[in-house]
Amino acid sequence: MIPYLPYQRKPFLNFCLEFFHFPILLVPFGREKRPNTEIQPDGGCKMRETDLADELFGQPGKTALPAGVRVATARQGGVTITRVEIAREGLARPRGRYVTLEMPSVSVLDERDTDVIETGAAELRALLPPEGPVLVLGVGNRRVTADALGPRTVQKVFVTMGPRTVPVPGIRPVAAVAPGVSAATGLSLQQLAGALVRELRPAALLCVDSLCSAEPERLGPTLQFSDSGLHPAQPDHSRHLDAARLGVPVLAA
């Protein structure tokens, strides 16, 4: 997942930020009545909401961690890796493993950056089952730039599942779909994901979605992988997907 800034409560005003090679549209409708920002002592502005586990629980040695939370940081292949493990329920995020990767902005990366690619692939592979088909779900609205990461990613997935595909040695069966949004389909994300899982019976569901970040400078260079399922900060629980609801491991990226 790549973070975006949370929605603002500023009617009649759209904020456009540079992201990849196209602008981000921040929808001017708030999710809550309270302000979404707080002023820092240095005069800067910080968002209150975040989907990133390392922003919620801080860095090791800098903030006191609640019981049941472990945080570790490492650097590999030009990537700073922060691993957050939540071992109990009742905290700000569901129980599970969260891996945050900070790297050069994805807008300047290409296939030549093999160290970054291999590091990210290794972290994602560690969360997936060792074998079996994977269904990639591109979550989001392709018509809204800030929410289009999932559908755009699905367009680039190497699909190896299907009656006319030829098995590739060393690559597991992979299917990919962008289910759209409920306003366009009339179906919730849970309904569509459940139907696909029942039909395909994958070993795991990998959801690709945009994330909400509290720090504007993390737009672009930050990814998060998680094995706890898809749990956006939004109050709309019809977008939440996890193993308890679907019966298969659900990863978010």
Pin down the residues of each PLM region.
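An N-terminal, well-structured beta->alpha segment
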Residues: I86-P129
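Glycine-rich phosphate/diphosphate-binding loop of Rossmann-like nucleotide-binding domains
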Residues: N141-R172, A176
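A structural signal for small-residue-enriched, beta-sheet-centric alpha/beta enzyme cores
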Residues: V177-A178, Q191, C207-A253
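Short glycine-rich or small-residue beta-strand-to-loop segments that form or flank ligand, phosphate
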Residues: T100-P104, P133-V144, A176-G180
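N-terminal amphipathic/basic leader segments beginning at the initiator methionine
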Residues: G44-G96
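Gly/Ser/Thr-rich loops at beta-strand to alpha-helix junctions
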Residues: V139-L149, A183, S210-A214
